[in-house]
């Protein structure tokens, strides 16, 4: 399944569990597709600086996560709270707020069909390479 290989390896937090939930072409939005995943960050886990070039909607299920986009304020999200990341945002902080408990959240992405989920961050903004875990099989 392409979605499973798409989620197989990434710059997502070390030891994070990534579970694909669904991928769907969006007929009412030509050239766009939706992708939904769950992530479980182990205690103390964090993500490197990244971007999605997509609309990303985050919803926390368990634990707490700290999020920030470049130019924005760092916020701590608890279960039931959400976070939005726009297509031009650079996600500078993405970490489990706890060093003792895991954090679980859902991410729903609205992106260009076939586009990389985690493309390289602009080298003038930050240094990050494309993610093989979420990008395998995509051009």
Could you tell me what each predicted segment is?
Residues 1-35, 68, 84, 102, ...:
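A short, N-terminal "cap"/entry segment at the start of jelly-roll beta-barrel domains
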Residues 74, 88-115:
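Ligand-binding loop in jelly-roll beta-barrel domains
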Residues 26-31, 40-42, 71-88:
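Short acidic-glycine-tyrosine-enriched beta hairpin
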Residues 52-71, 79-81:
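Glycine- and acidic-residue-biased ligand/ion/polar-headgroup-sensing regions
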Residues 36-38, 57, 82-84, 107:
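Conserved hydrophobic/aromatic beta-strand scaffold that supports enzyme active sites
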Residues 30-31, 51, 59, 76, ...:
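Extracellular/periplasmic catalytic domains that process cell-envelope and extracellular macromolecules
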Residues 46-48, 66, 83-96:
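Histidine-centered metal-chelating micro-motifs
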Residues 22-54:
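N-terminal targeting signals for Sec/Tat export/insertion, comprising classic cleavable signal peptides
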């Amino acid at each position: 399944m392409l979605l499973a290989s798409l989620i197989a390896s990434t710059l997502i937090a070390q030891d994070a569990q990534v579970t694909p939930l669904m991928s769907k072409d969006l007929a009412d939005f030509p050239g766009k597709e939706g992708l939904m995943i769950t992530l479980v960050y182990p205690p103390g886990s964090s993500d490197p600086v990244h971007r999605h070039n997509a609309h990303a909607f985050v919803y926390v299920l368990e634990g707490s996560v700290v999020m920030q986009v470049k130019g924005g304020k760092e916020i701590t999200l608890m279960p039931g709270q959400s976070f939005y990341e726009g297509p031009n945002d650079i996600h500078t902080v993405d970490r489990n707020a706890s060093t003792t408990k895991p954090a679980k959240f859902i991410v729903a992405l609205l992106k260009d069909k076939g586009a990389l989920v985690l493309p390289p961050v602009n080298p003038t903004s930050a240094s990050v390479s494309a993610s093989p875990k979420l990008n395998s099989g995509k051009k």
